[in-house]
Amino acid sequence: MMKKNKPTVAQTLSPEEEQAKFFEEAKNNVMIQGHHMKLSLDNSKLMDALKYASNIINELRTSLLSPKSYYALYLVAFDYLQYLNTYLYEEKHGKKMIELYEVVQHAGNVLPRLYLLITVGSVYIKTKQAPAKDVLKDLIEMCRGVQHPTRGLFLRHYLSEVTKDKLPDIDSSVENGTVMDSIDFIIQNFTETNKLWVRMQHQAPTKDRERRENERLELRLLVGKNLSRLAQLDGVDQKTYSEVVLPKVVEQIINCKDKIAQQYLMEILIQVFPDEFHLATLDIILQTCAQLQSGVDVKTIIASLIDRLANFATRNADLVPDNIKIFDIFFNNVKEIIQARPNMELQDILGLHVSLLNLTLKCYPTNKDNANEVLGLCQSIIVNKAKEDINKPTCVKQIIQLLQIPLDVFKNVLVVLKLSNYQPLISCLSYNNRKKVSLDIVNNTINNSTIIEEPEAVNNLLETIQTLIKDEQDQPDMDDIDKEDFQEEQNKVASLIHLFDSEDPEKLFKIYIIARGHFGKGGPHRIRHTLVPLVFCSLRFIRNFKQQVDSGVISLDENKWIAIGSKIFTFVSETIKALADIKLADLSFRLYLQALQTFDHCGLVSRVKELAIKALLIFQEDIADFKAQVMALQLLISTLNSLSIPNEEIYESLAAQTIKQASRLLLPQDQAKLISTCSHLFWVDNPSRQYQNPDSVLQALKKALSIISNESSPGLGTFVDILNECLFYCDKETDAVPIQFVSDLVELIRTTHVKEADPALPYLQNTIKYIQSQNYKGISI
């Protein structure tokens, strides 16, 4: 019984595998034919070699290979043809070039015929057996015979490669050809090459269009090399470029109406020719950009040109003719291009503005109007765009860059704020981005230590960074804002106040009023940070002002001084009150005391009493924590003790109020300690003021002792505190505190309140040692 054969299944290759197979077959054939060609040449069999060379080129007639694979095959074939080229030039083959030139024209197929013609023709030119211009003209015309996009493209590339060192230039004889002949040859080849490259898009079905476009891009150098050849000709000077080369090149770029070709060719045009040429033909290039297809990325083209010319003008300012206004040309053309392209992406529009701004600040750093024009044009475009477009990350990045560039270049916020279109551009951003820009402005001001002397400039700055200063409609809820970041931002804003300064006191006070007006809108979360330094700067201001008056720098009579002091008092008082109104009691209390000392130093006594009363009022109504009350009273006593109030009635009234508040403290120990401390209010021994009231001193100490003695568990520490206060007056050798009173107090402590476990016992022992060391008369230990 016969076995049945298993049916064979045809193996299906993937497109990539199939392509690799076709390429390997073609390459192997080329290498086989190339091997035979070399053997024939080595044996001086030229006609056989030409036959094998024709066979090599026949492999390039294929339509099975992708452009990428075809390119690889072309390179293999090119190497063999170069071998033939070298042989024809170097070997004695017994034939004239004119004969060979005619022989190869009888090759059977068009493509091998033309490759061989070009190969022989290049040697024909090199051996100078025929004028270059005639051979080049003949070859360029014959290449029209191949209109297949891929085959024609590589044929013309071969023509360009093998003739590149044989083109007539400035040192050529007239008979051989001139540089104009070379220009005509290259431009004609460029035009036809580009047409073939553009036609490649139609070789693939619609569904494969994207793949074909990518393959086309891989071959772009074959077209661009023609422009490189033009740029390498020594005979192409600026005049020739402007009048001959550029018009023909841009005509082809515009007429091809292909976005890929237009994009690449404009980019390569800008790359290969010198900056001086572009400078002289700027209008033509930009007008060409305006005529490109809508899908062309003109932003990249123009930005590249701007960057190149900006760098050139910076390095070679003396080479830029006065009649060429680079910025004006770019600005006007860019504006027209944007208007002519209503569908142009916003990020591309913004990118052009960034390039324009960099251009003007590099080429015309002192011309602020140009920068302002760029910002103004940008702002006028943005206001008509949808918010979702403006807030795209790419667009936001460009806008912020536009706003950052002037800060980085000028390093002076005063210069930047004179750009009238700067602030309106900020307002186009979302809250978080406005805040970021505002922080950049603040950081720039601080880092460069920019002193702001004019009220108008201060107002302009604070209006510009208003996102940091007050609540805005589009800001997130305070609960959603990072507290540490917020505090850091507000601290930076507050530090600006120290950069507001002027030698003119009137201007400086006006600056503080303006700052207060802006900061006052900040709400409770902000003013706790911003108003405090404003208070201190205002107090420093009145001290300095008083010093100038006293030294005669400023001439002012007493009444005028009091009037000015009253204005500053009102300003400071209202500023502190704003903090008190948001329940910052402890802070407000301390600021009132600071102000109290300052106004006392300046001799404004009536204001001292008002400030002390305000401080006492806050103490009574708003400081509830008993520990905070103790600390506040200690601070108040110290402050009052340092004053130089000449009016004893006012001073004694304040001292009495202080004792009254001390007697209202929660804990008897605190009452006694603070009242004993109040005794110092009646014994002032300062260089600026002498005031002693022995009766009041003793009365305060007795009152303190009475309070603590009535406690069931008074504790030793408070008694020792009172004893130490008494010793202070003994050391002053005053009769305010009788020795007998001190002696009785010591005895009372030793007999009644000393317990072995009391933590204050070492305190008492040290005090006793001190008494013993001083040998007070009348105090027995």
Swiss-Prot record:
Keywords assigned by UniProt, alphabetized: Endosome, Membrane, Protein transport, Transport
Gene3D superfamilies assigned to the protein according to its UniProt record, in alphabetical order: Vacuolar protein sorting-associated protein 35, helical subcomplex Vps35-C
InterPro entries in the record: Vps35, Vps35_C
Keyword Protein transport: yes
UniProt topology in membrane: Peripheral membrane protein
One example of a Gene Ontology biological process annotation: protein retention in Golgi apparatus
Primary residence: membrane
Claim: tRNA processing is one of the keywords in the record: no
Organism domain of life: Eukaryota
Gene Ontology annotations for the cellular component aspect, listed alphabetically: cytosol; endosome membrane; late endosome; pathogen-containing vacuole; retromer complex; retromer, cargo-selective complex
UniProt subcellular location: Membrane; Endosome membrane
Self-association and partners: Component of a retromer subcomplex consisting of vps29, vps26 and vps35.
Function: Plays a role in vesicular protein sorting. Component of the membrane-associated retromer complex which is essential in endosome-to-Golgi retrograde transport. The vps29-vps26-vps35 subcomplex may be involved in cargo selection.
Family stated for the protein in its record: Belongs to the VPS35 family.
PANTHER family in the cross-refs: VACUOLAR PROTEIN SORTING-ASSOCIATED PROTEIN 35, VACUOLAR SORTING PROTEIN 35
Protein's UniProt name: Vacuolar protein sorting-associated protein 35
